[in-house]
Amino acid sequence: MSPSESAKKNEKISEEATVESKAFSISVEKQTPDLDGLIVEELCMGNPNGKKAEPGKRVSVHYTGKLQGNGKIFDSTVGKSRYKFRLDAGKVIKGLDVGLNGMLVGGKRKLTIPPEMGYGAEGAGSIPPDSWLVFDVELLNVK
C-alpha cells in the first residue's frame, strides 16, 4: 500500500469513527434515567401538536415486552389488538405508568424497567423473579 493509499484509508477510518461517535452521543442524549432506575429512550417523538399521555388519561399502545438478560419476548400486542388502560391508575406495572407519562401520540419509546418497577421478587408467569424488563412501546391514542 502506497503512503497516499494508507493516508486515505486512515482518513476514512477516522470519518467512520466520528460518525459512530456522533450516533452514540445522540443515542445517549435520548436516554433519560429515572431516579428509580427506569431508563427511557425516546426512539420517535410523536406529533408535537398531538395529545400527550398524562396521569388519568386513557391510553392505547402497542408494545413488546422482553427480558433484558436474554431478550426473550414474554408478551406483545404487535399484530394483535392495541392495549388500552388508564395511565397512573395501577392497572399496569409502575415502569409502564411512569415511562409513558409525557409521551406524544405517534411516539415510540424503549423502557428499561428495574425489577422494583416491574414484577419484583415474585415474578409473573414466564418472567423470573427480580427480572429487568425491556418494553418497546408505541403510543397510538390518548383520550
Curated annotation (Swiss-Prot):
MF terms (GO), sorted A to Z:
peptidyl-prolyl cis-trans isomerase activity
**Which branch of life, at top level?**
Eukaryota
InterPro entries found in the cross-reference section? PPIase_dom_sf, PPIase_FKBP_dom
EC number per UniProt: 5.2.1.8
Does Repeat show up as a keyword for this record?
Answer: no
Write the record's keywords in alphabetical order, separated by commas: Isomerase, Rotamase
Catalysed reaction(s)? [protein]-peptidylproline (omega=180) = [protein]-peptidylproline (omega=0)
Q: Where is the PPIase FKBP-type domain?
A: 56-143
First-level EC class: isomerase
The UniProt transmembrane annotation reads none
One Pfam family cited in the UniProt record for this chain: FKBP_C
Per its UniProt record, what PANTHER family does this chain match? 39 KDA FK506-BINDING NUCLEAR PROTEIN, FKBP-TYPE PEPTIDYL-PROLYL CIS-TRANS ISOMERASE FKPA
Task: Describe the task this protein carries out.
Answer: PPIases accelerate the folding of proteins. It catalyzes the cis-trans isomerization of proline imidic peptide bonds in oligopeptides.
Official protein name in the record: Peptidyl-prolyl cis-trans isomerase FKBP15-3
Query: Taxonomic lineage per UniProt?
Result: Eukaryota, Viridiplantae, Streptophyta, Embryophyta, Tracheophyta
> Which gene carries the instructions for this protein?
FKBP15-3
